[in-house]
Amino acid sequence: MGEYERTVFTRRITGVETEYGITCVGDNSRRRLGADEAARYMFRPVVEEWGSSNVFIPNGARLYLDVGSHPEYASAECDSLSQLIAYDRAGDKIVDQLAQRAETALATEGIGGRVYLFKNNLDSLGNSYGCHENYLVSRDVVLKTLGRQLLPFLITRQLICGAGSIQDGQFQVSQRADHVWEGVSSATTRSRPIINTRDEPHADSHRFRRLHVIVGDSNMSETTCALKIGSTQLVLEMIEAGALSHDLELSNEIAAIREISRDITGMAPVPLKAGTSMPAIEIQRRYAEKALCWLEQRGDTEGTPNAEMHKVVSLWLDTISAIESNDLQALSRDIDWAIKLSLLRRAQRRIGCSESDFTHPKLAQLDLAYHDIRAGRGVFPVLESKQLVNRWINDTDIEQATRIAPSTTRAALRGEFLTAAKKLQAPISADWLRLKVNRPEPQIIELTDPFENTDDRVDQLISYMRNHAASYSTDTAIS
């Protein structure tokens, strides 16, 4: 384990990429827009304001249309758990505002229609789209070696943070479990692994790697999201520190992830490479109990404070205990799949279905409506507004995160640069690493350390734009 002892990130750069499902329901007999056309209407204001449908915005995030006309929001670099949840939720608000503007444009043009955005991972045809987690790790880490200790956790993690789904008339804990085909791979779509190893650190490649986890479900619940990200951060810390001594490697990772998704009790035995087997929920308990011990020696440094991590571990252990005792009611305010299942159970009773029958169309409608992000319309937003589910952060944090980049990471520099460029209508381009002023003479800098939130070179770029503001035309594209 010596290879992990050199760097333990208790302050870790983390980000989440969310692809949203989109559909447009026309008014009465008017023509219905396809998803691709609805997405183009939605991104019209983005193109008008920034000159592209693939942009970085002043809160530090990337906003773009992904393959298959899925609006995608990639959060800015965050270095604490609550910060990340705020910027993830900010993405929901930003894309929903675009959807509402699209509805206004459709009405103005006499087309009409309601644009629906779903924070889920499956469409009605069974196509899967993702919620990708990004964790900064040291270049010292060999991802395939790390994967051997991380995969048992990620495969069983769906029990504590799955979004729940009806597939083929059956309830499953996870929406993504049936749509991954490898444990660790450099592919993303063709074979779709649990951990993607493509080497794109978006930082100094001599110092950092980006661990790209693509197996997770999109979460509506803040507490579920906090448990998903917080538990993973703690497991990574323990792996880096050499604090995980047990061997829980699974004999067949893909068979296991599918079987676990179909067993809400978590008690189905999972075969291990060692030749024994263990219930999935027991594997989670092993990790959670190790995390509780780890917190005693972790140290309260920058990033997510120990008090918040203790809150994560407490929720983690409580969730495991509730699943072990089949007390799903205890999870019905905190864990997405259990919240959804409790709603489906009520609907089954109203319809007259048995608890094992999920074939009724109204259940599928409820399954989808749970993920509608529109306040006052989506099922989960209504639960949240009625205080029927628990929160991790508050609305003020989310609103601020829609406008201002995280102040503690590199994103602050990008946000400051983009805000100034927008005000000055300067011709610029930006990505995760680079900031560029295109004219009069190209000026470019690279920000290779995602932990740094100050840099004199950014101040110089902004001064350069101000000095040449008179030469910038009003139709300049910002990309």
Swiss-Prot record:
Protein name per UniProt? Pup--protein ligase
- What chemistry does it catalyse, as a reaction equation? ATP + [prokaryotic ubiquitin-like protein]-L-glutamate + [protein]-L-lysine = ADP + phosphate + N(6)-([prokaryotic ubiquitin-like protein]-gamma-L-glutamyl)-[protein]-L-lysine
Instruction: Give the family per the record.
Output: Belongs to the Pup ligase/Pup deamidase family. Pup-conjugating enzyme subfamily.
EC class, as a word, reads ligase
Function of the molecule: Catalyzes the covalent attachment of the prokaryotic ubiquitin-like protein modifier Pup to the proteasomal substrate proteins, thereby targeting them for proteasomal degradation. This tagging system is termed pupylation. The ligation reaction involves the side-chain carboxylate of the C-terminal glutamate of Pup and the side-chain amino group of a substrate lysine.
Q: What is its EC number?
A: 6.3.1.19
Pathway the protein contributes to = Protein degradation; proteasomal Pup-dependent pathway; Protein modification; protein pupylation
Supply any other comment: The reaction mechanism probably proceeds via the activation of Pup by phosphorylation of its C-terminal glutamate, which is then subject to nucleophilic attack by the substrate lysine, resulting in an isopeptide bond and the release of phosphate as a good leaving group.
Q: Which PANTHER family match?
A: PUP DEAMIDASE/DEPUPYLASE (PTHR42307), PUP--PROTEIN LIGASE (PTHR42307:SF3)
Q: Which UniProt keywords apply?
A: ATP-binding, Ligase, Magnesium, Metal-binding, Nucleotide-binding, Ubl conjugation pathway
Q: Where does this protein hold Mg(2+)?
A: E17, Y64, E72
GO BP terms: namely: modification-dependent protein catabolic process; proteasomal protein catabolic process; protein pupylation
Residues annotated as binding ATP are: R62, S75, W432
Sample GO molecular function, one term: magnesium ion binding
**One Pfam family recorded for the sequence:** Pup_ligase
Active site residues per record: D66 (proton acceptor)
Q: InterPro entries, per this entry? A: Pup_ligase (IPR022279), Pup_ligase/deamidase (IPR004347)
